[in-house]
Amino acid sequence: MVNETGESQKAAKGTPVSGKVWKAEKTPLRAKSRVVKNKKLTSWELKKQKRLEDKQFKERLKALKDEKEEARQAKITMLKERREKKEENERYERLAAKMHAKKVERMRRREKRNKALKER
């Protein structure tokens, strides 16, 4: 803008470039300012909320079931291991009755070594 003296002057903030100061200044539209507080939910929002609650409930149930199943499987594996150890000890006792103790001990060590190699 150029004033009467011929000097160029920078437009003040808030005034339009055209210089038409009689027009109202507009503020930018902000969606958050238009939200109505305490409004009732629409049927779609209710359905969405119910769906979310159902999903969370099912996830909790699934987590509980998984935890229960893990405990059950741990118990089963523990029982299997115990039975295997017991069976192995009984077998060694039967062998010890037939053979010399040192020979049985050597056999036991050899079998453990073979088992360790096999598991690699």
Curated annotation (Swiss-Prot):
Claim: Ubl conjugation is one of the keywords in the record: no
Bias-annotated ranges (Basic and acidic residues): 81-96
Keyword presence, Coiled coil: yes
Compartment(s) of residence: Nucleus, Nucleolus
Domain of life: Eukaryota
One cellular component term from this protein's GO annotations in UniProt: nucleolus
A GO BP entry: ribosome biogenesis
Induction data: In response to cytotoxic stress but not genotoxic stress.
Pfam family of the protein (one): Cgr1
Comp. bias (Basic residues): 97-113
Coiled coil location: 47-106
Keywords noted in UniProt: Coiled coil, Nucleus, Ribosome biogenesis, rRNA processing
UniProt record similarity statement: Belongs to the CGR1 family.
Note: Present with 2340 molecules/cell in log phase SD medium.
Functional note: Involved in nucleolar integrity and required for processing of the pre-rRNA for the 60S ribosome subunit.
This protein's name: rRNA-processing protein CGR1
